[in-house]
C-alpha cells in the first residue's frame, strides 16, 4: 500500500500509529528499564486492541467502550474499596478484601472492564495493576496494615503477569510478610502443572491463598484438596437464608468440619442478615464477610459497628 501511494498519491492509505506512555522519575537504571518496559507493553497492548476489535466485529458503541477501557488501563485508573472480614470469635477486623472500582465518569462497572480487557487481551494488565494499586494502599496505610491485618486480592483465573513486572511485584509483596492473601476460584480449572507453578510462585512470595466461591458449580472436596488453600470462602449461594434450610446447614457444617480437620480457615461470604450471622457462628465458621457486618468503602475502617460486634460476641458465647 505504501509503495502504491508513493507511485500514485491518489491511492488512499490508512496508517495506524501505536504508542505507549509511562511517566515517572527513575533514580536507577532498573527504574528506567521498568518505565521503558511498561511503555512498550502499553504500545503493544494498543496495537492488539485495535486489531482485536476489528477482527471480532464489535459495534461502534462496543469499539468506543473498548477504547475507554484501554485508556483506563493505560492511565491505571483502577481504584479499590475495602470490605472488612471479621473474626467470628470476637468481632474484630481480621482482614480486608480489595474490590475493584473504576475512576471514570460515566461510571463503568468492574465486569465491563474485565470483559473488554479480555477482548483486548489485556487481562494481565488488570492483574498487575490490581496487585500494585492495592499494595500501594497497604504500604501507605501502615497504621491499619501493621502486620496484624491481611488483605485479600482477587486473581483473574488463568492470567500470568508478564515477566518484566513479576520481579517488581515479588519484591513489593515480600516487604509485606504475612499480609497478602490471593483469592483463586474453582472456575479457573487450573491444570495440575499450572497449579504447581502457582503454588511455587506464591510460596516464594510468602503469600497465602483463599479458594473463593466454594460451594458453587461443581465444587467438591477433591478440588479443595487439590488447591489446599489457607482459607476457603463459602459462597453466598449456600448462606442465603441458611437459618431456614437444614440441608444448607448440614452441607456448610461438613465443609467447616473438613476444613478444620485439614488446617483450613473457613470464611462465610455474603452474610446479609442477623439470622445468617447467628447461624454461621453456630455452625463454627471462623471468619465473616458481608453487608451485615460492614460494606465496602474507599475509606478503610478500623472497626465494625459496635452493635454488630456485640451481637457476634453474644452468639459466640452461646457456642462455648
Where is each model-derived feature located?
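Short helix/loop segment flanking the catalytic signature motif in cyclic-nucleotide metabolism enzymes
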Residues: 1
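A short glycine-enriched loop-to-beta-strand structural element that forms part of the catalytic core
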Residues: 4-40, 149-154
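EAL-family c-di-GMP phosphodiesterase catalytic domain
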Residues: 24-28, 57, 88-92, 102-106, ...
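Charged helix-capping and loop-helix junction motifs
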Residues: 64, 165-169, 196-197, 246-253
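Short, well-ordered coil/turn segments that N-cap beta-strands
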Residues: 15, 146-151, 175-180, 205-208, ...
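Active-site core of bacterial EAL-family cyclic-dinucleotide phosphodiesterase domains
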Residues: 53-118, 294-298, 319-320
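Catalytic core of bacterial c-di-GMP phosphodiesterases, primarily the EAL and HD-GYP domains
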Residues: 22-24, 123-197, 270
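Surface-exposed amphipathic alpha-helices with a cationic face
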Residues: 139, 173-174, 196-206, 253-260, ...
Amino acid at each position: 500500500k505504501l509503495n502504491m501511494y508513493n507511485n500514485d498519491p491518489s491511492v488512499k492509505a490508512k496508517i495506524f500509529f501505536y504508542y505507549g506512555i509511562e511517566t515517572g522519575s527513575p533514580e536507577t537504571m532498573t527504574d528506567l528499564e521498568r518505565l521503558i518496559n511498561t511503555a512498550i507493553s502499553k504500545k503493544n497492548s494498543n496495537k492488539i486492541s485495535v486489531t482485536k476489535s476489528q477482527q471480532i466485529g464489535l459495534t461502534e458503541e462496543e469499539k468506543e467502550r473498548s477504547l475507554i477501557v484501554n485508556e483506563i488501563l493505560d492511565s491505571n485508573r483502577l481504584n479499590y474499596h475495602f470490605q472488612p472480614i471479621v473474626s467470628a470469635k470476637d468481632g474484630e477486623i481480621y482482614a480486608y478484601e480489595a474490590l475493584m472500582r473504576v475512576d471514570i465518569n460515566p461510571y463503568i462497572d468492574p465486569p465491563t472492564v474485565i470483559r473488554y480487557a479480555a477482548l483486548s487481551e489485556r487481562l494481565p494488565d488488570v492483574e498487575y495493576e490490581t496487585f500494585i494499586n492495592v499494595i500501594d494502599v497497604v504500604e501507605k496505610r501502615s497504621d491499619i496494615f501493621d502486620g496484624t491485618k491481611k488483605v485479600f486480592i482477587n486473581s483473574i483465573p488463568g492470567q500470568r503477569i508478564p515477566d518484566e513486572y513479576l520481579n517488581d511485584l515479588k519484591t513489593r509483596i515480600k516487604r509485606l510478610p504475612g499480609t497478602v492473601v490471593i483469592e483463586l476460584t474453582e472456575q479457573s480449572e487450573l491444570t495440575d502443572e499450572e497449579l504447581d507453578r502457582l503454588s511455587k510462585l506464591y510460596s516464594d512470595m510468602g503469600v497465602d491463598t483463599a479458594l473463593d466461591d466454594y460451594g458453587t458449580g461443581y465444587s467438591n472436596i477433591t478440588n479443595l484438596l487439590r488447591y489446599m488453600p489457607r482459607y476457603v470462602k463459602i459462597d453466598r449461594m449456600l448462606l442465603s437464608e441458611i437459618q431456614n434450610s437444614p440441608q444448607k446447614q448440614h452441607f456448610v457444617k461438613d465443609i467447616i468440619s473438613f476444613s478444620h480437620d485439614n488446617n483450613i480457615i473457613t470464611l462465610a461470604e455474603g452474610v446479609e442478615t442477623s439470622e445468617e450471622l447467628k447461624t454461621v457462628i453456630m455452625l463454627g465458621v471462623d471468619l465473616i464477610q458481608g453487608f451485615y457486618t460492614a460494606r465496602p468503602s474507599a475509606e478503610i475502617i478500623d472497626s465494625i459497628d459496635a452493635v454488630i460486634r456485640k451481637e457476634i460476641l453474644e452468639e459466640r458465647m452461646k457456642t462455648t
